[in-house]
Each structure stands twice: as structure tokens, then as C-alpha cells.
Amino acid sequence: MKQLVIITVSILLVSVIGLRTYFTLVPPPEPTFQEALSDLMPDDIKGWRIKDHDMADSPEASSRVSDFLKFDDAIFRTYEQYDTAIGLYIAYWKPGTASYRWAGAHTPDTCWVVNGWTRNERAYSVPFSHAEREFEPAEFGVYEMNSNEQNVYFWHIVGGRAYSYKQTKVPNIFSALIDIKNFGLNLRKEQFFVRISSNKDFETLKSTEAMDQILEALYALNMDKKEVL
């Protein structure tokens, strides 16, 4: 038994050293996304009040968030009409900027809950479609604070594929190997984190002009559903 443990640990160490050597010698691929998120997302919709916000509540907090997440572009824009409010948050990382797990560390399950929100519902890898086009599977949750309940769909897109946050019993020591299995050896692909939140349910929102334009714009982020390999 002891010998088996030693062999297993040795294999893991060799794998880690090999990966570090690979990532040091092989440069990350060139980014394919060249547009500014603020230009890409709708900013003028008849009958809707649209506003851009800092990535957090204050410039200081926004600076800290930016330093922590190290994104290359980001946008936080809200759309309001009567009693309907939609929040759109998108962050972008060029290849090699951040690890997949680090970039995905600001999901509502972490940031929102840490800041006082209660998670009432959660679903993983949820089918999501618009205008007969399928998106990569989404993450879904319902979060509430001070009687303000928000329905949230979010995606962490890695090289065009959704990164799932479904919990498993696999120890964290194998997390890098799981990423390689799912995304290939080059773990330095373009990443987007997209979050859509609203005080209304999404079946209602899909009939609105704002949601229609938002979802149409998101196709440019390579979020179409990919064939399972």
C-alpha cells in the first residue's frame, strides 16, 4: 500500500513538472476576440433606460476587483423598463491571462453569497436557447437579499465551451488533470464570464426587446452550443 502511494505521488509530481515546463516553453495562442465589450452589447433600445456601472460599488472597489480578477475587458450594464430590470455582466480574459478556476472564482455562488446574498435555488448545465439557436449550457441560480430576489443565468466560456461548476467528489489535487481532459493540454484559451440577472423570470424576459438584443449580441462571444467530443 505504501509503495502504491509513493508511485501515485511520484506520477503526480512528474505530471505537474511536465505541465509547468510545457506552459513555460509554449506561448499562449493569439486572441481571436478583438472588439470592445461596451461597443458589442446593445446600448440604445427604445423604451429602455440603459446605464453602465463600475465593476463594483466604488472606484476603489472596482480597482481591487480588476486587480484580483485581472480581466482584459469587462462591462456591467443595466437595462430598465417600468418594473423590469436586467443586469448584464461580462468579463474577458485573453489566452494565458488567468487559470480557468481562478477566472471563474467570482460566480454568484461565491461573490454574491459572501456579500450577503442567500442562494435559494441552484441548477447546473441548464439547456438555454434563443430564436431556435442553442447556447452552451448555462448555470442557473436564484439569489435574494433584503427581499430583492434575482434570477441569474451565467456562463464561464473557455475556448468556446461552457465550464461546468457541478460539484464532484474528485479531490482538488486532480483538478488540473480534469481540466486537461475537458479542454485539452493547452489550458490557456480565451475566456468569457457572462452573467444575466433580473427580478423577472427568464421566460417573461425572452419576450422583451432588451433581452432579444442582448442574446443576439452574445452570439459574438462564441457561445453557440458545441458538439460533444
How would you describe each model-predicted region?
Residues L25-D44:
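Alpha-helical transmembrane signal-anchor/signal-peptide segments
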Residues D52-F183:
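Short, solvent-exposed recognition patches
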Residues Q3-I17, F23, P27-P28, E121-L229:
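A short, solvent-exposed beta-edge/loop patch
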Residues L40-D44, Q81, S147-N148, L187-K189:
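A generic structural signal for short, non-catalytic loop/turn and secondary-structure boundary residues
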Residues M1, F33, M55-R64, E203-T204, ...:
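General structural signal for secondary-structure boundaries
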Residues G47-W48:
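Short conserved aromatic/hydrophobic patches within beta-strands of well-structured domains
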